[in-house]
């Protein structure tokens, strides 16, 4: 870039880009990786500067498919063998109808679901990481997942999603106490790291989006 920052390379995280509506979900997640790998190849030409765009790719895969997800993971790797690094599973949901779920529409308790665990077990043999996007009430479930699979690298997204809307409105102290307790416990899992960002979303309840 010309901003003065020396951005050597970037990592792409799944966002449902370029899904073909005529394809099944198994094919759609591969559509995205194919698209992003093409952008990375364009970047590698050097025509757009020195920064290596999408040098790492984190895609999506339906781990609730259990053992059947293995073929999907292998297709991701075959499409981008040098760049594909892991998957993200969007588990962020809450039964409170005033709190939006992610576009993935996850089921409740997905991180402790047996079929999910069956699918999750296919990450370690392929040296793939796991990006966890959940709300703070789901942190205990993520702790269970991290302990069950200690050899799989887990990256916590968005500070663990502290909520400040819906039934959590005006409950900052209660929310922080719960969040702090479980973030501290999660930090004891040596296979877990945290990615900083995503604390200014509407769901966090700071209402910064209303400022003029």
Task: Label each residue range with its predicted role.
Residues 1-126, 146-148, 168-170, 177, ...:
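Mid-domain alpha/beta scaffold segments of enzyme catalytic cores
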Residues 106-212:
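Catalytic pocket-lining loop regions of alpha/beta-barrel enzymes
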């Amino acid at each position: 870039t010309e901003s003065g920052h020396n951005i050597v390379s970037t990592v792409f995280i799944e966002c449902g880009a370029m899904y073909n509506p005529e394809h099944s979900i198994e094919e759609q997640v591969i559509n995205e990786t194919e698209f992003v790998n093409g952008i990375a190849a364009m970047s590698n030409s050097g025509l757009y500067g020195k920064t290596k765009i999408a040098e790492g790719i984190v895609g999506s895969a339906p781990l609730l498919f259990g053992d059947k997800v293995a073929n999907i993971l292998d297709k991701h790797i075959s499409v981008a063998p040098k760049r594909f690094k892991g998957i993200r599973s969007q588990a962020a949901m809450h039964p409170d109808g005033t709190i939006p779920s992610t576009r993935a529409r996850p089921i409740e308790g997905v991180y402790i679901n047996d079929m999910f665990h069956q699918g999750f077990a296919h990450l370690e043999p392929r040296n793939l990481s796991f990006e966890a996007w959940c709300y703070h009430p789901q942190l205990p479930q993520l702790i269970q997942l991290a302990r069950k699979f200690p050899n799989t690298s887990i990256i916590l997204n968005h500070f663990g999603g502290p909520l400040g809307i819906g039934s959590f409105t005006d409950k900052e102290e209660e929310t922080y106490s719960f969040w702090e307790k479980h973030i501290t416990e999660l930090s004891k899992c040596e296979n877990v790291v945290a990615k900083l960002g995503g604390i200014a979303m509407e769901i966090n309840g700071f209402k910064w989006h209303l400022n003029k």
